[in-house]
Amino acid sequence: MNTRDLEAFLAVVETGSIVGASVRLHLTQPGVSRRIQSLEERLGVALLDRQSKPLKPTAAGRETYAQGRRMLRVLDDLKTGLSPKGVVSGEFRLGISPYLSEVGITTLADRLRGSFPDLLLRITTGWPEQLLEQLRRSEIDVAAFCLPDGMHPSTEIEADALDIQPLFVVASQSLDLPSPATLQDLSPFPWIFNQDGCGFRSSIQRRFEQEHLPLRIGIEALSSDLRLSLVARGLGITVATRAAIESSPLRAALQIVPVQDFEPRVRAWIVRRPPVGRLVRPIACLTSALEAVIDEQAPGSNQRDSS
């Protein structure tokens, strides 16, 4: 089997189009099409549903994708092992949650590119369940995300637990809230969260369910800066890390609300499917860089008065 034909097929599946694959592989569109046709002729099956937009693999195509991705990974491992200096090359596909991406994507990318200049880094964002599913389908090599403290990733994958991060309830200074407040006091207010699937949001939802209290979702906003801006305007309350609160340009308009018997926390995880082969060192580098990013978000790293 021609590995270049296989690479073209994988690129079409991952980009969803001949155009996207041609850009990724630096080939003409007819060149990509010829490679796909060559692979289909060799295997004797149709690999793509050409009526779908974006292009999607057939049942045979999905199996070919999974097997082909593993095959190319083995070849990359072999190349790395035979390299005179052990140079790590090939793709490193990282899936990362929006929060970790927001606070540390540049640090992670810089560290990986500096340590492994021949490694082609591909990064996607998603919520934990999405990333775990992509990991199961071999669409990514490793995932980094946060889960509420006490929750663990699936047992069929390898997972490294990183530091726990405390979260703080944040409201506008204009809101007259008792200090400390109770969850009952907070229940009437709308909450400003990420979309469903966020570890922060899951942590709050679980506790409100335990107390049999309604949780009102007022606004869904992806950026922590935007959420804090909306909170400062009195449009709702949210949770955030200490570092995000203290670094906000609207800090003077925000108050951290102590809440009785409520200390929401999330833990960061690095997860992957064994074996990792040539990616052992890049994953170790990623883990070290992410630990440094999380340390910077710790309460003591940039702490001011909490009111």
Where are these regions (language model features)?
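A short LG(V/I)-centered, amphipathic sequence patch enriched
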Residues: E40-P57
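Alpha-helical linker/hinge and terminal dimerization helices associated
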Residues: R42-L43, T64-G86
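Short helix-boundary/capping micro-motifs
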Residues: L10-T28
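Central regulatory/effector-binding core of bacterial HTH transcription factors
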Residues: S89-H152
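A late-sequence structural motif
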Residues: G104, L177, Q255-G300
